[in-house]
Swiss-Prot record:
Pfam families: Oxidored_q5_N, Proton_antipo_M. The keyword Electron transport applies. This is NADH-ubiquinone oxidoreductase chain 4. One of its GO terms (molecular function) is ubiquinone binding. It is a multi-pass membrane protein. The keyword Membrane applies. The gene is ND4. Belongs to the complex I subunit 4 family. The chain crosses the membrane at residues 4-24, 28-48, 53-73, 87-107, 109-129, 141-161, 173-193, 212-232, 245-265, 272-294, 306-326, 330-350, 373-393. It catalyses: a ubiquinone + NADH + 5 H(+)(in) = a ubiquinol + NAD(+) + 4 H(+)(out). It comes from Locusta migratoria.
Length: 444
């Protein structure tokens, strides 16, 4: 594990070079391909070295982090062309990648907590440094307060786990039985806010709307998945309590997902719509993890990977339109098929992947999550029907409203898009649909 970490760390001095943008980009791509072929054990921890090691769950999420960070650099080439501190931007992306790499590969719960929290700092830098509106300061405050206040109780829980077991080394931890209810709440509350669960989701649309494209991609692609990964790890310690209390979180998130789907119908801001749809998808992931069965955990992994790639691609599409027309409003970005006909196919492909139509990885994830939630309680089937149906409705609403109809009369001319943009969208769509063909990787 350390060899990959050191390769990322030694990319940082390259940022001091005058023209490092595409060099760092190519080297992270190379690293992701080397890392891809390195896993040799599906079920056990492998590549263990000095409190770092991966199992299959963290391996897939590290791979997703490397992939999304490459695509962030590709998508943000307007920073490179305008020479708005491109070297510092690459440095922040590398710093964020190091934090994410260490979070997903930490075998000590305390070091996981430290890296989990410190991944907020580079994200805040991205929002404050390269965001668009002055309101980005408020979005940054929302982001910090929601996530930091929610995760302080988790620190107390880690100290008490250390008291009980005299270690925080993950493979040595066991379930400590029926402790008390607050212990359970504090353990998972930080991760539920990060996901985010309904009622604590207000920071997410705010952060997305104010963030640059790179910030939106990393938020939707990886940082929400940190919450799911944290719940998966903590379930080992609180599974006995989970049997008693999981029904409450599961019901809240599923009911919240349906309400958020209704909120999506009311959105006219493209970014805001995609951000709210992330909350609806993550509610399914929370439910899968809370059922604590094999279908649920593996389904939530495949939906996290699928959603990370597809929503990142949708944010790229909204940014392409924003850079061309200077607006994210659906009232102005309508009838785009008349102006950018070849971009419409990418809108369709990524929208269909986002609503879990075949052959995307989201379909595998949603099937297994439906399986696990209905096996947990057959009464949930009504809410699941609503959630699946409405997710298709608001995605099709976004696609048809933005692509079809008359174009806005104030738009006189529009570029068809650059090769870089089509290449970027292909690199989102291709792994998303390729992984569906190898679904057995997720259900070993």
């Amino acid at each position: 594990m350390l060899k990959y970490l050191f390769m990322i760390i030694f990319l940082i001095p390259i940022c001091l070079l005058g023209n490092c943008w595409w060099l760092v980009h190519s080297l992270i791509f190379l690293l992701s391909f080397i890392f891809m072929i390195s896993l040799y054990s599906y079920s056990d921890l492998s590549m263990i070295s000095y409190y770092f090691g991966v199992d299959f769950y963290s391996f897939m999420l590290i791979l997703l982090s490397l992939w999304i960070c490459c695509l962030m650099i590709t998508a943000s080439s307007s920073i490179y062309s305008s020479s708005y501190h491109p070297n510092f931007f690459v440095f922040v992306v590398l710093l964020l990648l190091i934090m994410l790499f260490c979070s997903f590969s930490s075998l000590n719960l305390f070091s996981f907590y430290i890296f989990f929290e410190s991944s907020l700092v580079p994200t805040l830098f991205l929002i404050l440094g390269w965001g668009y509106q002055p309101e980005r300061l408020q979005a940054g405050v929302y982001l910090m307060f929601y996530t930091l206040v929610a995760s302080l109780p988790l620190l107390l829980v880690l100290f008490s786990i250390n008291d009980l077991f005299n270690t925080l080394y993950y493979p040595l931890l066991i379930d400590f039985g029926s402790f008390y209810f607050l212990f359970y709440v504090f353990s998972i509350f930080a991760f539920l806010v990060k996901m985010p669960i309904f009622l604590f989701h207000l920071w997410l649309p705010k952060a997305h709307v104010e963030a640059p494209i790179s910030g939106s991609m990393i938020l939707a692609g990886i940082l929400l998945k940190l919450g799911g990964y944290g719940i998966f790890r903590m379930m080992k310690v609180i599974s006995c309590l989970g049997l008693s209390f999981n029904y409450f979180v599961l019901s809240l998130s599923l009911f919240g997902g349906v309400i958020i789907s209704f909120v999506c119908f009311r959105q006219v801001d493209l970014k805001s719509l995609i951000a709210y749809s992330s909350v609806a998808h993550m509610s399914l992931v929370i439910c899968g993890l809370m059922t604590m069965n094999w279908w649920g955990c593996m389904g939530s992994l495949s939906l996290m990977i699928g959603h990370g790639i597809s929503s990142s691609g949708l944010f790229c599409l909204s940014n392409i339109i924003y850079e061309l027309l200077g607006s994210r409003s659906l009232l102005i970005n309508k009838g785009m098929i008349n102006l950018m006909p070849s971009m419409t196919i990418w809108w369709f492909l990524l929208s269909s992947s986002n609503m879990a139509s075949p052959p995307s990885l989201n379909l595998l994830g949603e099937f297994s999550l439906l399986n696990s939630i209905i096996s947990w309680s057959s009464y949930m089937i009504l809410l699941l029907i609503f959630l699946s149906f409405f997710s298709a409705v608001y995605t099709l609403y976004m696609y048809s409203y933005s692509q079809h109809g008359l174009y806005y009369s104030g738009v006189y001319t529009c570029s068809l898009g650059y090769f870089r943009e089509y290449h970027l969208l292909f690199l989102h769509w291709f792994p998303l649909n390729l992984l569906c063909l190898k679904g057995e990787y997720f259900y070993f």
